[in-house]
A protein has these predicted regions:
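S-adenosylmethionine
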Residues: 1-167
Length: 167
């Protein structure tokens, strides 16, 4: 999972910007070992409720759940977080292998639609990073416009950022 590839230290301030249903958030919360804070956000009210339940079931006590669009959070938490995880909503091409029925629902314009949404999420996620903070961006699609395209775009917008390879 993306959370398993994102080193989090106890005491850090961590944001999971697209957190529901909570698998990534519970892993991040466990890594914090009760120290620091985890903000787990999802824009869907019903998904945020499921997220809250999962964090409670796993006993993550230093987390709170928000149900906000990224721009609203960025206005309140500018430069606040040490780490920001964005497992962005996407066109889902990576699900084709797991669920062939997904292929039938795919539409040609979906990657462009999601790339636009991802850029907005990325822009606001970066705003919430403290100087020197780290952001991990992931999707479950193969569409270059949603992966390399979104990363190239944010690096152009934020020249102070650098790409760090993950092994």
């Amino acid at each position: 999972t993306p959370a398993a590839r994102f080193p989090v230290e106890p005491g850090e301030r961590v944001l999971d910007l697209c957190a529901a249903p909570g698998g990534k958030a519970t892993a991040l919360g466990a890594a914090l070992q009760g120290k620091g804070v985890l903000v787990a956000n999802d824009i869907s009210n019903s998904r945020a409720k499921a997220l809250l339940k999962n964090l409670e079931v796993f006993g993550i006590s230093n987390a709170f759940v928000t149900n906000e669009v990224p721009q609203n959070l960025a206005e309140r938490f500018e430069g606040f977080f040490d780490k920001v995880l964005i497992d962005a909503p996407c066109s889902g091409e990576g699900m084709f292998r797991k669920d062939p029925a997904v292929i039938k629902t795919w539409e040609e314009e979906r990657p462009e639609y999601f790339a636009k949404l991802q850029k907005d999420i990325l822009k606001n996620g970066v705003r919430m990073l403290r100087p020197g903070g780290k952001l991990l961006y992931s999707t479950c699609t193969f569409a270059p416009v949603e992966n390399e395209g979104s990363i190239s775009w944010i690096l152009e917008q934020c020249p102070e950022m650098e790409l760090i390879p993950i092994e």
